[in-house]
Structure formats: structure tokens, C-alpha cells
């Protein structure tokens, strides 16, 4: 992808620590963020994935982005069912549904940066970036970014899932679906 993205797109730079996480994103279309370390706003337009040192020759760069389709709160146990003994198995995570991974050509190298946490940027900065440092929103544009983030935080993001049919359920069926016992 030649970095053609709307200049006003809101982008969350997210940390991808393991190749397995990249494969989950590519094959299953989701990315996980621990609730206790999550940024305040998850309802963004895109995720840009910063690859850590565990990626070998592809380390310390942003090589992929993906459009955000929605998000939900769940547990690590639900997300990674093959890890029932993990120390954080019962902790809450955001499961961010994403579209297909789009490769950035060329990728955006970290430059001098190595340790990165979540941060926000815009499509305009992504298009022009030569290094990760170039993604940092400058003071003159920071107010625009914070206003966009506040707007996303103040109202729930809609992800364009289209019209959903209304379904009428009997009280017993609804109670069963919600796990509510009869009184």
C-alpha cells in the first residue's frame, strides 16, 4: 500500500509484540489490548502496528495498518483459549475487530526509538512519515487531534454495520439468552 489514507483519519499506533499476534490479526481479523494499559479511546479509524524486537529482520518498524471495524470487552480466556493457565487468563481485554492488514511500502522504521507505547496520530502524518518520530503530532495540530479524540470518547462510535432487523423475543427466550434465572 502506498499510504493512501484520508488525512483526517484517526490512527492508534499499537504495539505488536509477537509474530503470533500478527498472524491472529491477519487470519482472524482482531487485535487485543489489555484493559488496564489501554489508551482512553479505542474507537479510531485505523490501527498501525509497531513491530517489536521479536520480529527479527522486520523489527522496530510499522509495516502494517488495518481499518478498525469495532471493538468489545472480553477476557483473555475467551480470546486465547489455548492458554488456560496464563497468569492473566481472567483479565479484561479489548478485542478490536479489524479489516485486512494493509502493508505500508515502504515501512516506517523506528529510527532511534525502540520502546513504544500506544499513541495517536493522523492519516496526514502517516502519509508523510519517514520514521516513527514523524508520526508524533506537533503542537500546532495537537488541539485538532485532542478535539477528535474527545468527540470519539463523548459519543459511541458507529462502525457502519448497516440496518439490523428488530427481533421480538419472548421473555423466557430473552432470559435464557441473558442467563437470567426465572424469579
Question: What does each model-found stretch correspond to?
Answer:
Residues 2-183:
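Structured alpha/beta reader/binder surfaces that contact nucleic acids or chromatin modification marks
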Amino acid at each position: 500500500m502506498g499510504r493512501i489514507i484520508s488525512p483526517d483519519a484517526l490512527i492508534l499506533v499499537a504495539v505488536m509484540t509477537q509474530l503470533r499476534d500478527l498472524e491472529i490479526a491477519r487470519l482472524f481479523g482482531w487485535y487485543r489490548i489489555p484493559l488496564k494499559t489501554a489508551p482512553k479511546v479505542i474507537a479510531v479509524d485505523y490501527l498501525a502496528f509497531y513491530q517489536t524486537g521479536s520480529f527479527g529482520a522486520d523489527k522496530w518498524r510499522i509495516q502494517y495498518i488495518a481499518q478498525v471495524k469495532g471493538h468489545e470487552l472480553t477476557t483473555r480466556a475467551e480470546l486465547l483459549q489455548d492458554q488456560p493457565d496464563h497468569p492473566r487468563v481472567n483479565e479484561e481485554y479489548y478485542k478490536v475487530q479489524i479489516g485486512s492488514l494493509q502493508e505500508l511500502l515502504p515501512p516506517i522504521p523506528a529510527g532511534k526509538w525502540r520502546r513504544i507505547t500506544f499513541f495517536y496520530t493522523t492519516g496526514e502524518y502517516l502519509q508523510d512519515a519517514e520514521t516513527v518520530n514523524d508520526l508524533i503530532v506537533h503542537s500546532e495540530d495537537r488541539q485538532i487531534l485532542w478535539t477528535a479524540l474527545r468527540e470519539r470518547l463523548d459519543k459511541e462510535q458507529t462502525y457502519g454495520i448497516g440496518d439490523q432487523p428488530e427481533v421480538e423475543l419472548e421473555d423466557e427466550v430473552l432470559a435464557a439468552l441473558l442467563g437470567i434465572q426465572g424469579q
